[in-house]
Amino acid sequence: HGHVIGFARTGFHITVTTVFVASAILLILIVKHQFQFHYIWAYSSRELPLGLLMSTFYAGQEGSFMLWTLMVSIVGIVLMLYTQRHDNEREVMGVYTSILAFLLMLLIVKNPFALIEGNVIPEDGRGLNPLLQNFWMQIHPPILFMGFAAMAPPFALAIGALMRRRYQDWVTSSLAWVVGGAMVLGLGIALGGFWAY
């Protein structure tokens, strides 16, 4: 068991590191106006100020999946540290890793690194949707996606408890995750409502 869990932890850390590196690369490509990438061409432009330019990271579906995967990775590191102190790491992290794997599969289908077809590299991008060119675009989506990610640990804890046939365990262990996730998600929704109205 110890060797398998050690390999699983190493694999999870490698996956999370890869997600961090891929996210950093995408952000660097956006800031450097690399319009040969379809996603960057479709959502950014040279005229955007730095804050809005960086927010084009998650302006489209591909980038939103990347942000979601990044947030799930961050929360996963915290969850792994939490479960290492308890006796449910194997089950909980197994379920949580399947959530991360699903998001990674979505990123394979909706690849933010897809190149524009043909040999012509555009001089400028199409730019950010005018409705999204707002200060709140820089704050609202990351908070919202962190809230989404924070709701995954209670699910993993519940399924892990079912796998162990310890049906009450997950309630107390997931309470802090539910409250914290609800607060972050509530803040994100409130900011979105403020932005919309």
Predicted regions located by residue number:
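Polytopic transmembrane helical bundles with strong interfacial aromatic enrichment
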Residues: H1-Y197
